[in-house]
Amino acid sequence: MSIQISETLTFECETGNYHTFCPISCVAWLYQKIEDSFFLVIGTKTCGYFLQNALGVMIFAEPRYAMAELEEGDISAQLNDYEELKRLCFQIKKDRNPSVIIWIGTCTTEIIKMDLEGMAPKLEVELGVPIVVARANGLDYAFTQGEDTVLAAMAHRCPERDLLIDENKVIQNQTIQNIFSLFSQKKKEETLKYLELKNHPPLVLFGSLPSTVASQLSLELKRQSIQVSGWLPTQRYTDLPSLGDGVYVCGVNPFLSRTATTLIRRRKCKLIGAPFPIGPDGTRAWIEKISSVFGIKTKGLEEREQQVWQSLKNYLNLVRGKSVFFMGDNLLEISLARFLIRCGMIVYEIGIPYMDKRYQAAELALLRNTCREMCTPMPRIVEKPDNYNQIQRMRELQPDLAITGMAHANPLEARGINTKWSVEFTFAQIHGFTNAKDVLELVTRPLRRNNSLEDLGWTNLIKKDNKIKVI
């Protein structure tokens, strides 16, 4: 009996509500990434409670973020918003002296029409500290889009690339080559290697990653003779990369479509549409795409990928043949599904709150090719999924694992479906060759837990009524 496998991806769109964290949660990782910044969230008590509980850091501990709490006087326009924000920002400058203050707008600032963009330039002149305004409110599709909003706002603050300066650098490099006789042999080799790496247009990568992961990706590109000119965001606001005509940019996360649009339209950069460096297959495709744009032939990438797959053998034996269902939460679903299919899993459905098909075109193409290579059915992709309909489909399909938001995890577990919180993939280190193990560690944890319970014989839930004797 022959099984016919669909050759194309199926896209559907339902009319469900968005079930996700508030995008102001981006403060959790961005304030740690941009070390000389201060985030001021302008919202209500609800926003403060969310930040305090979700981030696990007490506001009273004075981290590098704070709440500007709106009161009844602000909402009824009895107070002067500008004067109140001015007082707070001067206090922040006195206490913390940041290089940049980032205002995070919320739902309330949208509803009462606070003109944050109008107030920021005026206050910036008085304060002497740059103020970046980002509207990371709950009107977005997914909580990860908070980072997208902040990076899009910061892209406007990146310095303009000066072609004259770049030409002067070339002249200086040529002068250095002319006086090589003054250098040692080791110094000559280092300088030649540097000049060789710079023999391509500037490359800026955008997306917030831990410093160790960003260094790993930069090193992987350096092995292919590609030098990364800068990252957006940087660890220090004062080190933002230069942008402009002739600068190539490439994203590392699938939820940064707004930033990509800003870089293309406003800063005139050239976007490299590549799959995202999640999993060994995605990382290899990401490097190959960047190399092909610069006309550089890759070397040793296939062997590097095979080494990683070899090191994951124990995990692959556990997940091979298992099925997974993505309910949709953080916009990482397409990349994770592609990687898990490559690991031998069957993906029934990819629920995703929203997808920019232009920005994720390369990722979708790689997903399609991976399904053909692994001879597995093409998963259905459902935008804005309705959770009620999803539950009905899961009852029929009975997947081995459901990757879902925190709100649905316990109800699904009670119905006998293994779950994994999708938010964990957001905070885990999942990019690059070396972090593929962490992805599979998260995916296999529920499966390994169940295997351990079966070994103990704990397979049935037994309810026993104890009769209490009254003496």
UniProtKB/Swiss-Prot annotation:
Its cofactor is [4Fe-4S] cluster. The gene is chlN. Component of the dark-operative protochlorophyllide reductase (DPOR) that uses Mg-ATP and reduced ferredoxin to reduce ring D of protochlorophyllide (Pchlide) to form chlorophyllide a (Chlide). This reaction is light-independent. The NB-protein (ChlN-ChlB) is the catalytic component of the complex. GO terms for cellular component: chloroplast. It holds the Pfam family Oxidored_nitro. Protochlorophyllide reductase is composed of three subunits; ChlL, ChlN and ChlB. Forms a heterotetramer of two ChlB and two ChlN subunits. Disulfide bonds: none annotated. One of its GO terms (molecular function) is oxidoreductase activity, acting on iron-sulfur proteins as donors. It catalyses: chlorophyllide a + oxidized 2[4Fe-4S]-[ferredoxin] + 2 ADP + 2 phosphate = protochlorophyllide a + reduced 2[4Fe-4S]-[ferredoxin] + 2 ATP + 2 H2O. It is found in: Plastid, Chloroplast. Pathway: Porphyrin-containing compound metabolism; chlorophyll biosynthesis (light-independent). Belongs to the BchN/ChlN family. Its main location: plastid. [4Fe-4S] cluster binds at residues 22, 47, 107. Binds 1 [4Fe-4S] cluster per heterodimer. The cluster is bound at the heterodimer interface by residues from both subunits. It comes from Anthoceros angustus. Its EC number is 1.3.7.7. This is Light-independent protochlorophyllide reductase subunit N.
